């Protein structure tokens, strides 16, 4: 078996890092995790527009990011021996191929195509929700009101989840845990961070995600991850507490 090393940003905040980490962990893969930090994310950002504005912050140079293990400037990156795989969904695809017994995609071809479709929708969509509801596993923001555009994204997520669960019968989107669930886990986390009520049709799904051993392990690992100033400052600017949901 090749050596697997997943290079991530802090699992406290990085939704793109959480996704393949969950897929690999659920699959039972043996892999090491290396956490890197980007210098520009420890600076002071502008939050006056209700989002994280990095316009006036000089980004960490591409050469520095590559020195940390990136391929094209972003993280995560999975190294299979010395071969890098970048992009979260591609890493999840590798996990599905390398560990077929984990069932990370549905067996039925049509359901597998649907699972891939909603995973791709997560990659390319929901821009307003991602901008306004910055991912923060342990933070909580009381009294938060999403913008109209963000609410549209939230409504679409509930529509999508409800349709999948009605068809599959649960407990996960396609019956058993799949890459689709890994892709949407950070959305569930975001909704909790900002106090967005869950649609009644997805309450049991949320509980099934909470009970998943890979998710419980992620929360345990993430609480020890390095802090990112910009994300903590953003929650404070909204009147929130970055540590409100820390265990213990």
List the model feature ranges, each with a label:
Residues 42-45, 210, 228-229:
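Short Asp/Glu-rich motifs
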Residues 96, 187-188, 219:
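Active-site-flanking alpha-helical
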Residues 121-122, 212, 225-228:
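A short structural micro-motif
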Residues 126-213:
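GST-like fold's C-terminal all-alpha helical module
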Residues 222-248:
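Acidic/histidine-enriched, glycine/proline-rich intrinsically disordered or flexible terminal extensions
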